Amino acid sequence: VVEDKPNARKAIEDEAKAKKEAIDARTDLTPKAKEDLKAEVDAIADQAKKAVDKATSATDVDKIEEADKAAIKAVGEVKEPVDKTLVKDPANLTDAEKAKLLEEVKKVNPTAKEVKYDEDGNIEVTTQNGDKGTIKPADIVKTEKDLDNGKGGNDINKPIDKVIVKDPANLTDADKAKIVDEVKAVNPNSIVTIDDKGTVTVSTPDGETAAIPAAELVRTKEDTTKPDAGNSKVVKPADKVVGEATDPAAQAKVEEKLKDLNPTAKSVKFDEKGNATVTLNDGTTATIPAKDLFKSPEEAAQPNAGNDIVKPADKAVVKDPANLTDAEKKAIEDKVKAVNPGATVVVDDKGNATVTTPEGKTAVIPATDLTKSPEEAAQPNAGNDIVKPADKTVAANPEKLTDAEKKAIE
C-alpha cells in the first residue's frame, strides 16, 4: 500500500474545493456557467482520485497529484493547442505564422466569440460568457531545435491512431471514452478530459495543460480507405519487435523500423514507458503506445505472431516494384485482407499496404514484406520469408482441427 494515497486524496479534494469557491466568487459568470465549471472540477478530481487508487508507487501518486493541480487550475481558462506551430523566429513571426496561430487557437476554443491579437501582440480569446483570456504566442510555437525534446517540440503527446467513430459531429459516450483512453495511453499519469465538442484537454505532472481538437483524434470508417487511412502523416510498422519496451536494444530495432517507414523523420524518442514519439522534419509529431511496437516472446509464438495486423506468408509477384499495376496492387490487397478479416487495406504505387483493423488499429506493412520479383519467385523459397509445405495435411473437418492434425501441420 502506498502511504501517500490518503494525503493525495485530501490534497485533490482541497484543490477542488478552493477552485469551486473561486468560481462562485466570479461576477462575470451566469449561474449556469458556474455550475458547468464546478461540474468540470468535480469530474477532474474524481478522475484524479481513481488514478491515485490504482497507482502502484509513491512517485506515480505525486505525478497524478501534480497533474490534478494543473487540470483544476486550467478550468475556465482559455485553451492552448497541444501541437505547437513550427516557426523560424519566435521573436519575429511572419504574417502567415501569426495567422496559423490564430487558426490553431480557434480549433481548441470552438465556442469562443472572438480570437484576435491584442495591442501587446498576445492572442486574446473572448469566451461565450464574455470574459477574456490571453495566450502568449511564445507559449504555442516551436523552432527546429525544439523538435528533439522528446515530444516533437510540444509539451504533451498526441496519439498516432485516431478513433473510428460513426459521426464526428455527434460523439457517443463510448466514442469519448475511447478517445480519452487513447490520449491517456501516451500521456502517463496525466489528467485527460473531453468536452461536448470532442475537444480533449490534457494536464501533465509537469504542470502543462493543452488541448487537442476532436478533428485530430477521430476519423470515420470511410476515412480509413484514404492513402493515409485518415491518420497522422506519421506511420507505424505492422510487425512489432520482440523485447521489453524499456530495453535500449529493442528500442533501437523499433527506431530503425520507424525511420524506414518515415523517411522524413527528424527524431524518434522513447519515454519511460517505451511510448515512441516520432517527429517529422516539418514539425508533424505523433506518439505510438509501447503496446503497438513491442511484443513478448510468448506473444510472438501466438498465431498472429503477437501483432495486431498479420502479414501474408505468400508475397505477390510484381514486374516493377517501383511502379505497380492496378492488378498487382489488387493482388496484394486481397492477400492482406485474407489474413486480416474485416480490415481496410490501401496499397500505394510502391506496394506498401496501410491496414486498418475493425478495432481502429492502423499500421503499414512495407512492400518488401509483400512483393517479390519473378526471379525471386523462382528461388527455392519461392521468394517468401516463410516457406509453405508442399503437401497439405488431410483433415476430417477443416473448421475444427484435432490436436493430431495441428501437430502434423506444425
Where are the language model's segments positioned?
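Intrinsically disordered, low-complexity segments of exported/surface proteins
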Residues: 1-410
